[in-house]
Amino acid sequence: MRYALLIYNDSEVLERRPEEEQRRINNGIYEVLERPNVAGWLRLRNVEASTTVRYEQGRTLLTDGPFIDSKDYLGGFVLVESDNLDGAIAIAGELQELRAAAAIEIRPVLEENLVAA
């Protein structure tokens, strides 16, 4: 089964983090991402580069920035292959021990194809 680890960052923490500490964290993250059960990963640009699209009252609306105003923002995701949730939790736990994120949300990936009506 596949699990998506949604990585949430705190921009204030990242801005204050010393460069040497960030390098240490990045090296640890890289080791985790190189494992055979990590099927893929993506980093996202900062929230200032985001645009939110909504549909309200028959109109498409665009706004700058994230959907929710929060200090934590979605910074990327890791796709993990595991027999069960415990395997995904173990990888998320390792990333948290590195202090790689403010929070990591784990979600099972739907393996079904989208079927049109």
Where are these regions (language model features)?
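Conserved, structured core segments of small domains
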Residues: 1-117
